[in-house]
């Protein structure tokens, strides 16, 4: 007898080995129809998987996260099937699931066109409607190599040839198409109903620029029509908010081919930058951080001690001078330890908090660069706290409270909290890990935060809290971090004198709130669709005259507001006022002030707020009070 334990702890017995599909059918016809796969003792499998011993089983449907993964994986195969039907000379390579969808790489004699993409998607819909069964078979490695060579699929043959000779490989077939795959997959193509092909791009075989260029077709797939439509609507909204597009329209910054992955800030963009930096500098000052500054170029011997030279060298920019090798720093932490080590530190000095607006460089691959969100040169609000194990809890509580205030001030209300715990490969004693993990968890509880545990996702040198922002259109951005580090103080021999007179290692807490300022400003631009809150807006108010006779009065108004510390633009051009209002509105300014003869005579201004709101005529003093209130409230 085979005993199956279901998620509700109920048990079912079967006289002999049984498939996942058969168990689903024995529970009910509805479940049998909805089943996409199963999870047997924690492992996701096909519905055809044969259970031969007592096991725990949950049936996977489209409502489950694993079900969506199965749908996307199988839709990637459906894409390859359709391409082979329409372009028989194309060779298939790989097709993994990615966030929100999948892609598949093809070798073909020419790039696919938008018309090709439409035809492929149409063929996918037709193949799905045929509801062809998806079946699995297993072959010895060499047999599988010979099979794919015989049908002209040389990329597949190359992939399989790299697998150890004594291993078998699994193949999945739907209709006339068969592909190498570990699986699992949905039971038939009819389960794949809600998908869309998004774009085609170039990609090198095996990610190596020395290899052939392939065609990468991206797609998305969802469990329901509504979810697909919501995702496509979100993408449309994201396109309108794209910081690269808004950066150009609002004249904030540009990226130049002369310096790929590095940002040229224009005056208005740099004003935003300075606003963020000055705000964060005040955060340092108000919360017991001492601001420091370290060099950008550091001898490789330091990076050898920290382990970066072994593990991270490919991502570092290096240079040589006088027969010494140097690297542009990819992170600030080693420099802060060198500062900590200057002079004897006592337990009375702890916790010691350093903060730096540290410029870092990382040699990101060109394909991964994205506007100002993913760059090669960036500045972090990088802080490091040197403390004892007993001080971790309070430092984390204080940090979380501070982070929440900062995010609220920038307009973010929705924060997701995750605690990443010890991985199998780690340094430090279990006792130290217990203390650190407990401190992180207790700090979030003390702050009233709901959080998730991510088992095994901590770094080898310590656990961490990840703080993720959810933006106006539901996207998630991981910005803040609180990382416990037992390793680097040891590697770089940081010490303090304890109450007992002996030397001890401090614990190092790496913390960032906004992270990369470049990336955070990109997130801000997209969150607010370019209409930044008044306190951050590069131009807070534009003063417009209607005719030349009000020009001098307009200058006086602008000067008065500038003297109050406001960022003011004065537009005295001889253009129609409607044209000027429209032009400044497109720049998403918080306020536009119009002055005509009536306003001049009354010593007043006509006020328009963002969103084409007419606030009527105000005295200059009343307007100044209103905008000052906006700034004070971070509105």
Curated annotation (Swiss-Prot):
Residues reported to bind Zn(2+): 333, 384, 510
Cofactor binding notes: Binds 1 zinc ion per subunit.
Disulfide-bonded cysteines: none
Keyword Transit peptide: no
GO biological process: threonyl-tRNA aminoacylation
GO molecular function, one term: ATP binding
Enzyme class: ligase
Reactions the enzyme catalyzes: tRNA(Thr) + L-threonine + ATP = L-threonyl-tRNA(Thr) + AMP + diphosphate + H(+)
InterPro entries tied to this protein: aa-tRNA-synt_IIb, aa-tRNA-synth_II, aa-tRNA-synth_II/BPL/LPL, Anticodon-bd, Anticodon-bd_dom_sf, Beta-grasp_dom_sf, TGS, TGS-like
Domain TGS, first and last residues per copy: 1-61
Pfam families according to UniProt: HGTP_anticodon (PF03129), TGS (PF02824), tRNA-synt_2b (PF00587), tRNA_SAD (PF07973)
Subcellular localization(s) per the UniProt record: Cytoplasm
UniProt cofactor(s): Zn(2+)
E.C. code: 6.1.1.3
Entry's Gene Ontology cellular component terms: cytoplasm
Gene3D superfamilies: 3.10.20.30, 3.30.54.20, Anticodon-binding domain (3.40.50.800), Bira Bifunctional Protein, Domain 2 (3.30.930.10), Threonyl-trna Synthetase, Chain A, domain 2 (3.30.980.10)
Region annotation (Catalytic) ranges: 242-533
Keywords from the UniProt entry: Aminoacyl-tRNA synthetase, ATP-binding, Cytoplasm, Ligase, Metal-binding, Nucleotide-binding, Protein biosynthesis, RNA-binding, tRNA-binding, Zinc
UniProt subunit comment: Homodimer.
PANTHER family found in the cross-reference section: THREONINE--TRNA LIGASE, CHLOROPLASTIC_MITOCHONDRIAL 2, THREONINE-TRNA LIGASE
Role according to the record: Catalyzes the attachment of threonine to tRNA(Thr) in a two-step reaction: L-threonine is first activated by ATP to form Thr-AMP and then transferred to the acceptor end of tRNA(Thr). Also edits incorrectly charged L-seryl-tRNA(Thr).
Homology family: Belongs to the class-II aminoacyl-tRNA synthetase family.
Name under which the protein is recorded: Threonine--tRNA ligase
Gene, per the UniProt record: thrS
């Amino acid at each position: 007898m085979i005993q199956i334990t279901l998620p509700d702890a109920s048990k079912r017995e079967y006289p002999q080995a049984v498939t996942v599909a058969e168990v689903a059918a024995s529970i009910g016809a509805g479940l049998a129809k909805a089943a996409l796969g199963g999870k047997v003792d924690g492992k996701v499998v096909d519905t055809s998987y044969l259970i031969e011993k007592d096991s725990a089983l949950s049936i996977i449907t489209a409502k489950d996260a694993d079900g969506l993964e199965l749908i996307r994986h199988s839709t990637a195969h459906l894409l390859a099937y359709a391409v082979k039907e329409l372009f028989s000379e194309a060779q298939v390579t790989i097709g993994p699931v990615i966030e929100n969808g999948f892609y598949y790489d093809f070798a073909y004699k020419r790039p696919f066109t938008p018309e090709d993409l439409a035809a492929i998607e149409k063929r996918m819909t037709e193949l799905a409607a045929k509801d062809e069964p998806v079946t699995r078979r297993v072959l010895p490695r060499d047999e599988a190599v010979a099979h794919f060579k015989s049908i002209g699929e040389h990329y597949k043959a190359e992939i399989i040839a790299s697998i150890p000779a004594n291993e078998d490989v699994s193949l999945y077939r739907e209709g006339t198409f068969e592909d190498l795959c570990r699986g699992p997959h949905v039971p038939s193509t009819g389960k794949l109903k809600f998908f869309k092909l998004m774009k085609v791009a170039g990609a090198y075989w095996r990610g190596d620029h020395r290899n052939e260029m392939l065609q990468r077709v991206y797609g998305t797939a969802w469990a329901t029509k509504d979810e697909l439509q919501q995702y496509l609507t979100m993408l449309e909204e994201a396109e309108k908010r794209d910081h690269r597009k808004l950066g150009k329209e609002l004249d904030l910054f540009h990226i130049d081919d002369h310096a790929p992955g590095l940002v040229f800030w224009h005056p208005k963009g740099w004003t935003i930058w300075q606003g963020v930096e000055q705000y964060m500098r005040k955060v340092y000052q108000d919360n017991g951080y001492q601001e420091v500054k370290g060099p950008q170029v550091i001898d490789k011997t330091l990076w050898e001690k920290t382990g970066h030279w072994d593990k991270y060298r490919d991502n570092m920019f290096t240079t040589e001078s006088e027969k010494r090798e140097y690297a542009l720093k990819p992170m600030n932490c080693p420099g802060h330890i060198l500062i900590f080590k200057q002079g004897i530190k006592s337990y009375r000095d702890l916790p010691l908090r350093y903060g730096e607006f540290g410029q870092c460089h990382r040699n990101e691959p060109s394909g991964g660069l994205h506007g100002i969100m993913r760059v090669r040169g960036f500045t972090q609000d990088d802080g490091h706290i040197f403390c004892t194990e007993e001080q971790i809890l309070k430092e984390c509580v204080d940090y979380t409270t501070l982070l929440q205030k900062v995010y609220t001030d920038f307009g973010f209300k929705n924060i997701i909290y995750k605690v990443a715990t010890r991985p199998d490969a780690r340094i430090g004693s279990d006792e130290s890990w217990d203390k650190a993990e407990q401190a992180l968890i207790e700090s979030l509880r003390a702050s009233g935060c709901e959080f998730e545990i991510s088992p095994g996702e901590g770094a080898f040198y310590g656990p961490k809290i990840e703080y993720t922002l959810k933006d106006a259109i539901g996207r998630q951005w991981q910005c803040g971090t609180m990382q416990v580090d037992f390793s680097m103080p040891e590697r770089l021999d940081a010490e303090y004198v304890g109450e007992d007179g002996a030397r001890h290692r401090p614990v190092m807490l790496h913390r960032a709130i906004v992270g990369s300022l470049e990336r955070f400003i990109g997130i801000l631009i997209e969150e607010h669709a370019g209409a930044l809150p008044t306190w951050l807006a590069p131009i807070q108010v534009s003063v417009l005259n209607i005719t030349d006779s009000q020009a001098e009065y307009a200058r006086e108004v602008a000067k008065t507001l500038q003297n109050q510390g406001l960022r003011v633009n004065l537009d005295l051009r001889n253009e129609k006022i409607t044209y000027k209002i429209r032009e400044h509105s497109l720049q998403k300014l918080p306020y536009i002030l119009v002055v005509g003869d009536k306003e001049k005579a009354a010593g007043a201004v006509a006020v328009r707020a963002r969103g084409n709101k007419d606030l009527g005529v105000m005295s200059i003093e009343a307007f100044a009070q209103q905008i000052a209130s906006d700034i004070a409230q971070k509105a």
